[in-house]
């Protein structure tokens, strides 16, 4: 039986490389404010140098090769709509992100050749990237449907009802 895959944020470019390997098992992919990258580009190719250097240094200092969670970035860029209580709870779930995810160029040719339906679940209050950036990344891969939801980058956590309604709509397209 086929599955519907949902990828959020940096999982977008992870899925770009993984999905072609299991394309026969996937009915649809829903990207949620996900980084969808051109072939042979990494997420860091789209991040300002001053931010990259801070992230790389933090990963070195962590001793794990992972970028530690920046509470201020989460609060003001990812979970900008969360109450203080929700923000504190979210912080208990988040984990460091391996630097390699940010630095590895995506091999996206096989992804471009896939014939799997795609939908963007687009969180319209996301301020983690410039306005329209995630929409532009998605539309670069074709004229696929977009479902807008009125929430921030962490909408699944900060506005679960609104997010779930949008997700169900995306599933049913």
Please provide the spans of the model-predicted regions.
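Conserved alpha/beta-hydrolase "nucleophile elbow" surrounding the catalytic nucleophile
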Residues: 3-9, 123
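Flexible "cap/lid" loop of the alpha/beta hydrolase fold
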Residues: 20-26, 30-67, 100-107, 130
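Glycine-rich nucleophile elbow surrounding the catalytic serine of serine-hydrolase chemistry
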Residues: 7-17
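Active-site nucleophile elbow and catalytic-triad environment of alpha/beta-hydrolase enzymes
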Residues: 89-111
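Helix-loop "lid/cap" segments that line or gate small-molecule binding pockets
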Residues: 69-81
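Short beta-strand/loop motif that positions the catalytic acidic residue
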Residues: 114, 120-122
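Short, amphipathic alpha-helical "lid/cap" segments that border enzyme active or binding sites
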Residues: 160-168
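Conserved loop-alpha-helix segment in the C-terminal half of the alpha/beta-hydrolase fold
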Residues: 124-157, 169-170
């Amino acid at each position: 039986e086929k599955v519907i895959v949902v990828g959020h944020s940096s999982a977008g470019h992870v899925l770009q490389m993984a999905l072609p390997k299991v394309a026969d098992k996937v009915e649809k992919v829903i990207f949620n404010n996900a980084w969808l990258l051109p072939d042979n580009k990494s997420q860091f190719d789209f991040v300002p140098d001053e931010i990259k250097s801070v992230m790389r240094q933090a990963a070195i200092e962590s001793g794990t090769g992972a970028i530690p969670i920046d509470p201020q970035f989460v609060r003001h860029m990812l979970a900008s709509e969360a109450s203080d209580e929700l923000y504190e709870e979210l912080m208990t779930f988040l984990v460091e992100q391996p630097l390699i995810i940010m630095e590895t160029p995506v091999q996206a040719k096989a992804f471009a050749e896939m014939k799997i339906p795609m939908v963007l679940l687009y969180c319209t209050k996301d301020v983690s990237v410039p306005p329209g950036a995630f929409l532009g990344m998605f539309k670069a891969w074709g004229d696929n449907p977009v479902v807008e939801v009125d929430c921030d980058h962490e909408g699944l956590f900060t506005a679960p009802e609104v997010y779930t309604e949008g997700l169900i709509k995306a599933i049913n397209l």
